[in-house]
């Protein structure tokens, strides 16, 4: 027979009692609430939300997406440590930016000399495959960011460089010369630094701390190559 | 009455007892390496593993042996398998790069720095940086050489980036493949040869290309003598790195075969650097030519007008 050396709530009794014998004497006092309800209070509202986006006008849908994209542009232009870009990622912004950049960077197809600037497809491929490679690299190094979140951040942080491209295009309408080049160089360098700072602010936290430099260097190379393409753009 | 023995927890912490209960189980233990499944996919380690550890007298050869066996246990179609090739920290990559820049005679790069942890991060990103360094430097150098000419119109020469990428990546992957195949073949004939795994050879080649990045940037200087001195320095450093890595591997072999292998390795390396210099960078004497072609036009125009 089992003998308990000491039973709970009964220190120092001489008589041995079997284990758990006192359990039936325990009663739950009434002031500990042990009952409740399991409901999801938001449930009915979510269902209403779903059906309402189906019936709304096309303008509302487009405006909502455009506002989300615009909000993320603001986050890139004023990079703070927020995770709006990460939480509500979308790829519309990167697509718009990449298409704009590629359209402005492509060389004139009527003047297709052998060694000119990049074609539309080349810019597109560099941007998207570069972003995919950097994402794969950071995941392989052990980062805990998801694939599309990383693509989203890298795509959105091309915004300063697209602005630089627009400015360079405008500056190139003036007379060519060293002053022209200096202005473009300055603008591209500033926007390059801005892109790096913005993307590092979003991406650096997701890496293990002893590999942060390894994950950030490819981002630096990526934006450097894009800046080089912008700087060396010459209208035919 | 309940027996106390029935209520005791079963101890799971001891691998030995659970293995005696079930000998085929795979146990994972934090302190010691556990049993890993023997049917690993063909990671080309080869039978040379024990021999090279004995030959080169590494004092933590036990640890590297066991760690090497423990590492690649995921099947090759999972993501974790490829993550094992990126298992390096920042300081390790910097150490490997420093080791490739300062080859010390007698120190084997693979044994000293790679230590059974070959990574693909270094080779891949060093090659990517080198591709863009060569293309951008070549473009800049051509621009500076032809700067004063009236007939010169600057073009970004974007096509050269894809050509450079093809050349560099083909060199960094196909030459190690050929070398690994050759070493495996000799290993089957001469039993004492130290053989490296394919990834270690890729790793050595990748890190040996690092010296060409500052070399490519310095090739912008449009002086022929400076460029050739840079070629010699870079070839000296990376060639000696490769030689010191592969000499222990072919030392046991027939003298002529060993020498031929080393000479081929260095020759291919030289071919890469000289080829890149010749293709991407215009010769600096070209700026003299357009002034001589300009003057005949002027004389013809003067003759026509008179």
UniProtKB/Swiss-Prot annotation, chain A:
Role, per record: May be required for stable YIPF1 and YIPF2 protein expression.
Cytoplasmic side: 2-84, 137-146, 206-212
Residue list for modification Phosphoserine: 7
Organism in which the protein naturally occurs: Homo sapiens (Human)
GO CC terms of this entry: cis-Golgi network; COPII-coated ER to Golgi transport vesicle; endoplasmic reticulum; Golgi medial cisterna; Golgi membrane; Golgi trans cisterna; trans-Golgi network
N-acetylalanine modifications at: 2
Subunit structure, as described in the record: Predominantly interacts with YIPF1 or YIPF2, but may also form a ternary complex with YIPF1 and YIPF2. This interaction may stabilize YIPF1 and YIPF2.
UniProt similarity note: Belongs to the YIP1 family.
Transmembrane regions: 85-105, 116-136, 147-167, 185-205, 213-233
Listed GO MF terms: identical protein binding
Protein name as catalogued: Protein YIPF6
Keywords, sorted A to Z: Acetylation, Golgi apparatus, Membrane, Phosphoprotein, Transmembrane, Transmembrane helix
Recorded name of the encoding gene: YIPF6
InterPro entries from the UniProt entry: Yip1/4-like, Yip1_dom
Topology versus the membrane: Multi-pass membrane protein
């Amino acid at each position: 027979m089992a003998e308990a050396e000491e039973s709970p709530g009964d220190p120092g009794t001489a008589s041995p009692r079997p284990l758990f014998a006192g359990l039936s004497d325990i009663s739950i006092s009434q002031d500990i609430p042990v009952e409740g309800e399991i409901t999801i209070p938001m449930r009915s509202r979510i269902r209403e939300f779903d059906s309402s986006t189906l019936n709304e006008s096309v303008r509302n849908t487009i405006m909502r997406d455009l506002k989300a994209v615009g909000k993320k542009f603001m986050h890139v232009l004023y990079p703070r440590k927020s995770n709006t870009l990460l939480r509500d990622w979308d790829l519309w912004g990167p697509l718009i930016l990449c298409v704009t950049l590629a359209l402005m960077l492509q060389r004139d197809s009527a003047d297709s000399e052998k060694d000119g600037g990049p074609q539309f497809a080349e810019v597109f491929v560099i941007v998207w495959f570069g972003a995919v490679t950097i994402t794969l690299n950071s995941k392989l190094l052990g980062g805990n960011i998801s694939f599309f979140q990383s693509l989203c951040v890298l795509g959105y942080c091309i915004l300063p460089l697209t602005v630089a491209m627009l400015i360079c295009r405008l500056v190139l309408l003036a007379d060519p010369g060293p002053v022209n080049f200096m202005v473009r160089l300055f603008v591209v360098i500033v926007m390059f630094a801005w892109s790096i700072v913005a993307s590092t602010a979003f991406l650096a936290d997701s890496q293990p701390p002893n590999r942060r430099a390894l994950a950030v260097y490819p981002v630096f190379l990526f934006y450097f190559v894009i800046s080089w393409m912008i700087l060396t753009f010459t209208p035919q | 009455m309940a027996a106390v023995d029935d209520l005791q927890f079963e101890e799971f912490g001891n691998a030995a007892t659970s293995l005696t209960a079930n000998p085929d189980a795979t146990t994972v233990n934090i302190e010691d390496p556990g049993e890993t499944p023997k049917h690993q996919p063909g990671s080309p380690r080869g039978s040379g593993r024990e021999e090279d550890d004995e030959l080169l007298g590494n004092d933590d050869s036990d640890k590297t042996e066991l760690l090497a066996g423990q590492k690649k246990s995921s099947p090759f179609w999972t993501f974790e398998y490829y993550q094992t090739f990126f298992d390096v920290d920042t300081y390790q990559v910097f150490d490997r790069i420093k080791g490739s820049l300062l080859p010390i005679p007698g120190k084997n790069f693979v044994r000293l720095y790679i230590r059974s942890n070959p990574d693909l991060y270094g080779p891949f990103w060093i090659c990517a940086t080198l591709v863009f360094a060569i293309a951008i430097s070549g473009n800049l150098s051509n621009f500076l050489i032809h700067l004063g000419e009236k007939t010169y119109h600057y073009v970004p020469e974007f096509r050269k980036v894809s050509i450079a990428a093809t050349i560099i990546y083909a060199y960094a992957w196909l030459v190690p493949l050929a070398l690994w195949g050759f070493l495996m073949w000799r290993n089957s004939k001469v039993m004492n040869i130290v053989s490296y795994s394919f990834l270690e050879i890729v790793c050595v080649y990748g890190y040996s290309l690092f010296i060409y990045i500052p070399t490519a940037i310095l090739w912008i200087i449009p002086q022929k003598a400076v460029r050739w001195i840079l070629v010699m320095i870079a070839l000296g450093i990376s060639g000696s790195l490769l030689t010191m890595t592969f000499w222990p591997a072919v030392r046991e072999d027939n003298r002529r075969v060993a020498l031929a292998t080393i000479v081929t390795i260095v020759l291919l390396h030289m071919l890469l650097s000289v080829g890149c210099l010749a293709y991407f960078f215009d010769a600096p004497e070209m700026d003299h030519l357009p002034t001589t072609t300009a003057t005949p036009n002027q004389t013809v125009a003067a003759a026509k007008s008179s």
